[in-house]
């Protein structure tokens, strides 16, 4: 019979009531802490074409959610609806427990009813795009300090110091004064990740961050993303990289025709798919 180990045997005794109170406070804090992101019943229509047909998901703190699916399944549209780059037609979005206040626009889509709230909520989210979206007329460093200075109101010296730290993290400090045109695709995407980190978001959104890269450059970007996951950052990643989805994410979501067709533990979802459509998708991605 194994003898249990009591690491705190020499610790001072605490009154049972105090112990219970501390445990209750800890449980209460864990219970009421809002999730970084929650979507409920999200729809998006373009005329008669419905791209999203009621998507719901929850990202808990430290989650890495990989969203997989064929082209046209609604993956990128979903990310763009989260931060209102696209206006959803129906549904609810909560960021840090705060529901976005939405109203109907002239086309019948939902738009933010409170611009100050939109700016505040967007500061909790940061998106890394397929094609980097760096300003070509600015250096890497200038790209990264732009939002902290002009959106968050940081002092320039503090923004530069933080930006340089993030560039160290992604391995680009030595190229901080380069313009994007003088960087490889992988370097540009790493700069884009540093730019996203600079606003200290609660959730990082990645829209197929390796799809525009040459195959030999994919690994350097995935390694940076893996290090962010190991730091406990909350990430939602639209990806075709099945290895990343399996090994780095803790939850996989298969989107098909605007619906969550299957989700769960990545190893199980990818190794033992229940739906025929997911089996076909995985088979095709391995060719």
Name each model-derived stretch:
Residues 204-207:
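Catalytic Walker B motif of ABC-type/P-loop ATPase nucleotide-binding domains
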Residues 179-183, 187:
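Conserved ABC ATPase signature
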Residues 68-70:
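The feature captures the beta-strand-to-loop junction immediately N-terminal to the Walker
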Residues 178, 199, 231:
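Conserved signature/switch motifs of ABC ATPase nucleotide-binding domains
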Residues 263-264:
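ABC ATPase "signature
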């Amino acid at each position: 019979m194994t003898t249990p180990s009591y690491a705190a045997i020499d610790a001072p005794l605490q009154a049972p009531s105090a112990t219970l109170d501390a445990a209750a406070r800890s449980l209460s804090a864990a219970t009421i802490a809002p999730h970084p992101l929650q979507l409920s019943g999200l729809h998006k229509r373009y005329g008669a074409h419905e791209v999203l047909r009621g998507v719901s998901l929850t990202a808990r703190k430290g989650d890495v959610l990989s969203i997989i699916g064929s082209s046209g399944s609604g993956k990128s549209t979903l990310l763009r609806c989260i931060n209102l780059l696209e206006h959803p037609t129906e549904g609810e979005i909560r960021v840090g427990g705060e529901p976005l206040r939405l109203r109907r626009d002239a086309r019948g889509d939902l738009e933010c009813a409170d611009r100050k709230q939109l700016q505040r909520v967007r500061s909790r989210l940061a998106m890394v795009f397929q094609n980097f979206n760096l300003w070509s007329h600015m250096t890497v460093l200038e790209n990264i300090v732009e939002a902290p200075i002009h959106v968050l109101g940081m002092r320039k010296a503090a923004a530069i110091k933080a930006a340089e730290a993030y560039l160290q993290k992604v391995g680009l400090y030595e190229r901080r004064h380069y313009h994007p045109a003088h960087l490889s695709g992988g370097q540009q995407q790493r700069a884009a990740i540093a730019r996203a980190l600079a606003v200290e978001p609660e959730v990082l959104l990645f829209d197929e961050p390796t799809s525009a890269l040459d195959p030999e450059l994919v690994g350097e970007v995935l390694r940076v993303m893996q290090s962010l996951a190991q730091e406990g950052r909350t990430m939602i990643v639209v990806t075709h990289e099945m290895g990343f989805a399996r090994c780095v994410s803790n939850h996989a979501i298969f989107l098909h025709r605007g619906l969550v067709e299957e989700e769960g533990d990545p190893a199980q979802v990818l190794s033992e798919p229940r739906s025929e459509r997911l089996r076909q998708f995985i088979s095709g991605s391995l060719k």
